[in-house]
């Protein structure tokens, strides 16, 4: 096994995700999912091996220096769970005055995202393959983010699994500390129950977080959010989508 192969393959590991009680209190650490071997294609592996030095960020226990990473002081937007990364790359390409960091635990998605970033020749994007809760806790400085995007997270449909949902009181509390004044939180889901849960959690932080919806709940699908592969599939199945957009005072 070559050294380059080892680098990409070591990203395929078990990722732990924090588990919370229904009222948002930290409960314990659980193994939420496993990054399975055999799904990372040779092409995706090569993209990670060959371009990680430019696009990749590794987990660290101290805050990232975004100015050093990007070479400028442009606003930084963090996206959690970018899937295959196409919409994230498109957003970065359309907004060169913003810097984007994407977190994804599945290495095929990381490899695909890097490949598309290379194709689109974007310089304002970095990717991380690690548990998002640990990145937020350890590697993102307070007040350093201009925005947080979370599109179509796992809804954990069964009631007994709702505590595994990433959007919980403690999660949003941490997001609030990481955002700069005027920074945004943008969630999207195609599960109504999860949308209502997200809304209830976000409302707990009023007036520090302001809902931009004129109706006080959800916003229309914004044109600036590219259509994801996941969303397009949902549309074909007749699924509705709920967007929430809150801004920190």
Swiss-Prot record:
Chain residues that bind substrate: 158, 190, 228-231
Active-site residues (renumbered): 154
Residues holding S-adenosyl-L-methionine: 79, 104, 131, 154
MF terms in GO: tRNA (guanine(46)-N7)-methyltransferase activity
Keyword Chaperone in annotation: no
Catalytic activity: guanosine(46) in tRNA + S-adenosyl-L-methionine = N(7)-methylguanosine(46) in tRNA + S-adenosyl-L-homocysteine
Keywords: Methyltransferase, S-adenosyl-L-methionine, Transferase, tRNA processing
Broad class of enzyme this protein falls into: transferase
Name of the protein this chain belongs to: tRNA (guanine-N(7)-)-methyltransferase
Organism: Haemophilus ducreyi (strain 35000HP / ATCC 700724)
């Amino acid at each position: 096994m070559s050294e380059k192969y080892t680098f990409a393959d070591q990203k395929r590991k078990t990722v732990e995700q924090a588990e919370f009680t229904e009222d948002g209190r930290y409960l314990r650490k659980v193994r939420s999912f496993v990054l399975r071997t055999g799904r990372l294609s040779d092409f995706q592996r090569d993209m990670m091996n060959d371009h990680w030095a430019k696009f990749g960020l590794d987990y660290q226990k101290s805050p990232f220096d975004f100015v050093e990473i990007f070479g400028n002081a442009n606003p930084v937007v963090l996206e959690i769970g970018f899937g295959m990364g196409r919409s994230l790359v498109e957003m970065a390409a359309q907004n060169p005055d913003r810097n984007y960091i994407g977190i994804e635990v599945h290495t095929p998605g990381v490899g695909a995202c890097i490949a598309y970033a290379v194709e689109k020749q974007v310089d304002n994007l970095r990717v991380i393959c690690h548990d998002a809760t640990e990145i937020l806790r350890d590697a993102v400085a307070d007040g350093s983010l201009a925005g947080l995007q979370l599109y179509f997270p796992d809804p954990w449909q069964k009631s007994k699994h709702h505590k595994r949902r990433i959007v919980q009181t403690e999660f949003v509390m941490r997001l609030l500390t990481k955002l700069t004044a005027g920074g945004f939180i943008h969630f999207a889901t195609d599960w109504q129950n999860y949308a209502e849960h997200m809304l209830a959690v976000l409302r707990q932080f009023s007036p520090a977080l302001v809902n931009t919806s004129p109706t006080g709940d959800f916003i229309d699908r914004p044109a600036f959010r590219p259509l994801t592969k996941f969303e397009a599939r949902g549309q074909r199945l007749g699924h509705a989508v709920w967007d929430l957009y809150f801004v920190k005072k």
